[in-house]
UniProtKB/Swiss-Prot annotation:
Residues 458-483 have a biased composition (Basic and acidic residues). mRNA-binding protein that acts as a regulator of mRNAs translation and/or stability, and which is required for adult hippocampal neurogenesis. Specifically binds to AU-rich elements (AREs) in the 3'-UTR of target mRNAs. Promotes formation of some phase-separated membraneless compartment by undergoing liquid-liquid phase separation upon binding to AREs-containing mRNAs: mRNAs storage into membraneless compartments regulates their translation and/or stability. SUPFAM superfamilies: Eukaryotic type KH-domain (KH-domain type I). Residues 397-407 have a biased composition (Gly residues). The modification Phosphothreonine is found at residues 413, 599. Residues 584-596 have a biased composition (Basic residues). GO terms for molecular function: mRNA binding; protein heterodimerization activity; protein homodimerization activity. The modification Phosphotyrosine is found at residue 78. The gene is Fxr2. One of its GO terms (cellular component) is ribosome. Residues 228-276, 291-340 form the KH domain. It comes from Mus musculus (Mouse). This is RNA-binding protein FXR2. The tandem Agenet-like domains preferentially recognize trimethylated histone peptides. Disordered region at the C-terminus undergoes liquid-liquid phase separation (LLPS) for the formation of a membraneless compartment that stores mRNAs.
Length: 673
C-alpha cells in the first residue's frame, strides 16, 4: 500500500475509531475503502497499517455533541489497560461526583475496580453506530505531473475540500492520485465538476507563489547589497549578444569571480549591474562583460602593409590581442568619420582587448613609417651618388655602370653589405655589365677574385686582335680602360694585374715573314714610367703608352728572356710540356741585383738556343706571374692571350715576400695561334 502525504493541521485520512480486542476504541484513519473493509493506519503508528472489517470501525462523535454528565450515567473514559498500549475509549459508569473529580467504575472489570478521573477524560457514550459498506465514499482524480509536488501539501486543498463537503482530501504517493473520502454521496458528484477548475487554480497559485518567493529573495539580496560595492555600465544593443556570450558563458564567468555576489542585467536598457565584496572583484567582472567598438586611423598607403599578404599581419594582431573581430571601412561606408588620406580599422571586443590591439597596430604603423623614412633617405643618397658618379661613367657604356669606372668603384663595402635592402644598384660595384664574369659566392672584391674571370670574352678578344695591327694600336676606349684598371683597396688580397707584353698573332706572323728583323722588339716587357702627377695605382695615359711602344729598344732594356728566367713556375716547351730540367727560380730579387752589376745587362751566354715559340711561351708565363704593382695591363696583353689550354700554377712568393693570388697561364701550341 502506498503512503500518504500529510501536512498542516489536516488529518491525513478520514478519522475513525477502531475497536480493539479488549473492547476499547482506538483512534485511526481510513486510507482506502474496499468492498468489505477499510485500510486503517493508527495514530503514532503504534500498530502497523492493516485492513479492518467495517464491523470494527465507527465514526467519532460529532464535534458539537455535548451532554451533561451526572451520577449513574454511562460514559467513556480515555484510559489504557497497560503501559504498552495507547489510550482508548473504554465504557464505564459514574459512581460519585465531587467538584471536578469523578469516581468511575469500569463495566468490564470488577465492581471493586474504581478510578478517580477529571472531566477532560470523560465524554458521553458515542452514538455513532458501527460502519457498513455504505458508510464511506471514495473519489480518485489523476494529478498532472507538474502539480504533484504541490498536491502533496494538503493545505492547498482546503478550499476544494470545503467546496466539495468531503471529509478529507490527500495525495496517494504510490499511484499519484488525489483521494477524496466522504461519508456522504454529494462530494462524489461535485468532484467531477470542480476537478479541472481546482487544478487550474492550483497552477495559477503556484506561479504567483514562486514569484513572491523570488521577490522575497530579491528583497533580501538588495538589502544585503545596499552596503556593498557595485559597478554599472551600458553596452550597445548590437553588442549585447557578445557581452552575454554563448548560452550566457560570459555572465557565468563573471559570476565565478571571487568576491562577486550578484550580477543584474536590464535587458531593455542594456545595463549591467555588478555587486561585489571588493571593488577589484567588480572591475574584473566588468572586464568580462563590457564589450565596445573603437577604431584606429591608418594611412591609406600603408593599408596593404598593415593587412599583409592574405591578411596574415592583421590576423596576427587579432589573435594576439584577443579582439573578436576587426573591420576595415570602405570608402562608401559613412558610418564612422574619416580623416583625409586615412582608412579606419575598427576593432570589436572588450576594452582591454581593444587597447591591446591598438597598441600592436600603432607600434606596427610606427615601424612602417620608420622604414619608409629610411627608404626615402636611401633614395636621396642614391640620387646624389648618381649625380656625383655621372662624370666617371663612360658616355657610350651599356653595361649598367657596374663594369668598372673610377678607382673608387672598389670602395663599396657598405653598399655591398646592404644588399638585403637594395638588391639592385645602379652605381659602382662589379658583375653588373653584359658579357662579364659573374660570381655568386662573394662580393665585388675578395679572396676569390681572379682577373682571368673578369676579362672579356673570346669573341671580344678576337675582334680586338683583328682590329689591331702589328705595330701601333689605338688607345682603348674609356670603358675598356676602366675595366682593366686595378680595383681599389677592399676586402681580401688585391687582384693580380695583367702583364704588359705586346705580342699578338698578327705580330708573330710578321716576324715569320721577315726573319731578318729583330724578334726581340716584339717581346718588350719593360714598364713605362708613370707620370709624376698621376696617383698610385692609376694606369698611364693612352698617349704615353703609345709613345712608349714606338720607342726603339736598346740592349739595356729587359727582354722576354729575363722574364722567362725569373718565372716562378715550370716553363712550357713548344710541345706544351713542362721543362723539368730547369729548377724553379725563387729568389728573383737577388738575381735582379746581380744582373744590375753586369756591363752588358744580359744573362750568361751558356744557355741552350731557344726558338721564338719558346720566347713567346715564356713571356706569356712571365706576364701571368708578374706580381702586383709592376705594370698596368695594356691593350696588347688582352688580345695576346689566346692560348688553347689553361693550367693552374701553385702559389709562389712575390718580390716583396707576399703570397700572390692563384694565376691562370695560357700557352701557344707550335708557336702560332
Amino acid at each position: 500500500m502506498g503512503g500518504l502525504a500529510s501536512g498542516g493541521d489536516v488529518e491525513p485520512g478520514l478519522p475513525v475509531e477502531v475497536r480493539g480486542s479488549n473492547g476499547a476504541f482506538y483512534k485511526g484513519f481510513v486510507k482506502d475503502v474496499h468492498e468489505d473493509s477499510v485500510t486503517i493506519f493508527f495514530e503514532n503508528n503504534w500498530q502497523s497499517e492493516r485492513q479492518i472489517p467495517f464491523g470494527d470501525v465507527r465514526l467519532p462523535p460529532p464535534a458539537d455533541y455535548n451532554k451533561e454528565i451526572t451520577e449513574g450515567d454511562e460514559v467513556e473514559v480515555y484510559s489504557r489497560a497497560n503501559e504498552q498500549e495507547p489510550c482508548g475509549w473504554c465504557l464505564a459508569r459514574v459512581r460519585m461526583m465531587k467538584g471536578d473529580f469523578y469516581v468511575i467504575e469500569y463495566a468490564a472489570c470488577d465492581a471493586t475496580y474504581n478510578e478517580i478521573v477529571t472531566l477532560e477524560r470523560l465524554r458521553p457514550v458515542n452514538s455513532s453506530s458501527l460502519a457498513t459498506k455504505g458508510s464511506f465514499f471514495k473519489v480518485t482524480m489523476a494529478v498532472p505531473e507538474d502539480l504533484r509536488e504541490a498536491c502533496s501539501n494538503e493545505n492547498v486543498h482546503k478550499e476544494f475540500k470545503k467546496a466539495l463537503g468531503a471529509n478529507c482530501i490527500f495525495l496517494n504517493i504510490t499511484n499519484s492520485e488525489l483521494f477524496i473520502l466522504s461519508t456522504t454521496e454529494a462530494p462524489v458528484k461535485r468532484a467531477s465538476l470542480l476537478g479541472d477548475m481546482h487544478f487550474r487554480s492550483l497552477r495559477t497559485k503556484l506561479l504567483l507563489m514562486s514569484r513572491n518567493e523570488e521577490a522575497t529573495k530579491h528583497l533580501e539580496t538588495s538589502k544585503q547589497l545596499a552596503a556593498a560595492f557595485q559597478e554599472e555600465f551600458t553596452v550597445r544593443e548590437d553588442l549585447m549578444g557578445l557581452a552575454i556570450g554563448t548560452h550566457g558563458a560570459n555572465i557565468q564567468q563573471a559570476r565565478k569571480v571571487p568576491g562577486v555576489t550578484a550580477i543584474e542585467l536590464g535587458e531593455e536598457t542594456c545595463t549591467f549591474r555588478i555587486y561585489g565584496e571588493t571593488p577589484e572583484a567588480c572591475r574584473q567582472a566588468r572586464s568580462y562583460l563590457e564589450f565596445s567598438e573603437d577604431s584606429v586611423q591608418v594611412p591609406r598607403d600603408l593599408v596593404g602593409k598593415v593587412t599583409g599578404k592574405t591578411g596574415k599581419v592583421i590576423q596576427g594582431i587579432v589573435d594576439k590581442s584577443g579582439v573578436v573581430r576587426v573591420r576595415v571601412e570602405g570608402d562608401n561606408d559613412k558610418k564612422n568619420p574619416k580623416e583625409g588620406g586615412m582608412v579606419p580599422f575598427i576593432f570589436v571586443g572588450t576594452r582591454e582587448n581593444i587597447s591591446n590591439a591598438q597598441a600592436l597596430l600603432e607600434y606596427h604603423l610606427s615601424y612602417l613609417q620608420e622604414v619608409e623614412t629610411l627608404r626615402l633617405e636611401r633614395l636621396q643618397i642614391d640620387e646624389q651618388l648618381r649625380q656625383i658618379g655621372a662624370g666617371f661613367r663612360p658616355p657610350g657604356s651599356g653595361r649598367g655602370g657596374s663594369g668598372g669606372g673610377s678607382d673608387k668603384a672598389g670602395y663599396t663595402t657598405d653598399e655591398s653589405s646592404s644588399s638585403s635592402l637594395h638588391t639592385t644598384r645602379t652605381y659602382g660595384g662589379s658583375y653588373g655589365g653584359r658579357g662579364r664574369g659573374r660570381r655568386t659566392g662573394g662580393p665585388a672584391y675578395g679572396p676569390s677574385s681572379d682577373p682571368s674571370t673578369a676579362s672579356e670574352t673570346e669573341s671580344e678578344k678576337r675582334e680586338e686582335s683583328n682590329r689591331a695591327g702589328p705595330g701601333d694600336r689605338d688607345p682603348p676606349s674609356r670603358g675598356e680602360e676602366s675595366r682593366r684598371r686595378r680595383l681599389g683597396p677592399g676586402k681580401g688580397p688585391p687582384p693580380v694585374p695583367r702583364p704588359t707584353s705586346r705580342y699578338n698573332s698578327s705580330s708573330i706572323s710578321s716576324v715569320l715573314k721577315d726573319p731578318d728583323s729583330n724578334p726581340y722588339s716584339l717581346l718588350d716587357t719593360s714598364e713605362p714610367e708613370p707620370p709624376v702627377d698621376s696617383e698610385p695605382g692609376e694606369p698611364p695615359p693612352a698617349s704615353a703608352r703609345r709613345r712608349r711602344s714606338r720607342r726603339r729598344r736598346t740592349d739595356e732594356d729587359r727582354t722576354v728572356m729575363d722574364g722567362a728566367l725569373e718565372s716562378d713556375g715550370p716553363n712550357m716547351t713548344e710541345n706544351g710540356l713542362e721543362d723539368e730540367s730547369r729548377p724553379q727560380r725563387r729568389n728573383r730579387s737577388r738575381r735582379r741585383r746581380n744582373r744590375g752589376n753586369r756591363t752588358d745587362g744580359s744573362i750568361s751566354g751558356d744557355r741552350q738556343p731557344v726558338t721564338v715559340a719558346d720566347y713567346i711561351s715564356r713571356a706569356e708565363s712571365q706576364s701571368r706571374q708578374r706580381p702586383l704593382g709592376r705594370t698596368e695591363p695594356s691593350e696588347d696583353s688582352l688580345s695576346g692571350q689566346k692560348g688553347d689550354s689553361v693550367s693552374k700554377l701553385p702559389k709562389g712568393p712575390s718580390e716583396n715576400g707576399e703570397l700572390s693570388a692563384p694565376l691562370e697561364l695560357g700557352s701557344l701550341v707550335n708557336g702560332v695561334s
